[in-house]
Regions:
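Cap/insert and terminal regions of metallo-dependent hydrolase folds
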Residues: 161-244
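Active-site neighborhood of phospho(di)ester-bond hydrolases with catalytic His/Asp-centered motifs
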Residues: 34-38, 55-62, 94, 153-157, ...
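Short active-site oxyanion
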Residues: 30-33, 86-90, 151-153, 208, ...
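Active-site metal-binding motif and surrounding structural segment of the metallo-beta-lactamase
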Residues: 32, 39-88
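Catalytic core of the metallo-beta-lactamase
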Residues: 105, 115-171
Length: 248
C-alpha cells in the first residue's frame, strides 16, 4: 500500500513569490487526485506529476485561492495534447462552486464530470474512501477525510472553530489544518489561528499536525510556536510547497 500527500501550495488568501495558494496532490497506490487548486498549484503539479494521470479533483469551496488553477487544468485537458475524445474525470465540489464554474465557462463539462458533494457524501479515491464535513466559512465549504489501509488524511479547507472539524480529524495520521491568523490578531470570521489548530489536533488525537493557509503577512515561525504551545508533545509542522508526507 502507498498513500501520500504532497503540498502544491499552502499560502492563505493569495499566492506569494515563495508559496502558491492552497492545493495538494494525493497519491494512493497508482492513482493521483488533487485537493484544491489555488493560484500557483498548476505549475507545482507539473513539477511533481503528469496531469494526464489525474483521476479526479476535489475543490473545497469557490474562493479563488482554492480554485483558480482549475482553469489551467481545464485548458490543458481541453486544448492540450491528450488527443482524441477526452475522457472526463470527476470534479467534486459543493454545488454552489460547480454552478459558478459552469456559469463562467460551460465548456468545463466537456473535461470534467461535475459531481456535487455535501456532508453526507462518500466518494471513492481508487481504493480509498473520502468523506466530507461542513466547515464554518462564508461560502458552502467542506473539509475532507481520506481513509486508506487503516490510516486517514484530514484537510479542513477554510473554517472557523465552529466547523464540524472533529468529524474529519479524529485519529487522522496527518491533519492539514488552516491557521490563517495568529493569537494577537483580530478574529477573522470563518478562519482559525494556529493555537486553535493545535487545540483541535490534541482533542482529535491526530498523529501529525501540518499548518496551512497562513496569511502571507504572518510570521510563520511564530505561528508554529503558537501551535506547538497549544499542542505539547505533538508533532507539528509548517506546510511548504513540495513537502511530501507519507501515510503508508
Amino acid at each position: 500500500m502507498s498513500f501520500s500527500v504532497t503540498v502544491l501550495g499552502c499560502s492563505g488568501v493569495y499566492q506569494t513569490r515563495e508559496l502558491a495558494a492552497s492545493g495538494f496532490l494525493v497519491e494512493i497506490d497508482d492513482g493521483r487526485w488533487l485537493v484544491d487548486m489555488g493560484g500557483g498549484t498548476w505549475r507545482n503539479l507539473l513539477l511533481q506529476a503528469d496531469y494526464r494521470d489525474l483521476k479526479g479533483v476535489f475543490l473545497s469551496h469557490r474562493h479563488p485561492d482554492h480554485t483558480i488553477d482549475i482553469w489551467q487544468l481545464f485548458h490543458a485537458r481541453h486544448y492540450g495534447d491528450l488527443g482524441g475524445p477526452e475522457t472526463k474525470i470527476p470534479l467534486w465540489a459543493p454545488r454552489e462552486t460547480l454552478d459558478r464554474l459552469s456559469h463562467f465557462d460551460e465548456g468545463i463539462t466537456e473535461s470534467f464530470d461535475l459531481l456535487p458533494v455535501d456532508q453526507n457524501s462518500k466518494v471513492k479515491f481508487g481504493g480509498a474512501r473520502a468523506t466530507f464535513a461542513r466547515m464554518k466559512h462564508p461560502p458552502e465549504t467542506y473539509g475532507v477525510r481520506i481513509e486508506h489501509g487503516g490510516v486517514a488524511l484530514a484537510y479542513t479547507a477554510d473554517t472557523g472553530i465552529e466547523g464540524d472539524i472533529d468529524a474529519i480529524a479524529r485519529d487522522a495520521q496527518v491533519f492539514l489544518c488552516e491557521a490563517t491568523v495568529q493569537d494577537s490578531d483580530e478574529p477573522w470570521w470563518g478562519h482559525m489561528c494556529a493555537s486553535d489548530a493545535g487545540r483541535i489536533a490534541v482533542r482529535s488525537e491526530v498523529g501529525r499536525l501540518v499548518l496551512t493557509h497562513l496569511r502571507p503577512d504572518c510570521d510563520r515561525e511564530l505561528s508554529l510556536q503558537q501551535a506547538r504551545r497549544a499542542a505539547p508533545g505533538l508533532e507539528v509542522h509548517l506546510a511548504s510547497d513540495g513537502m511530501k508526507l507519507e501515510l503508508g
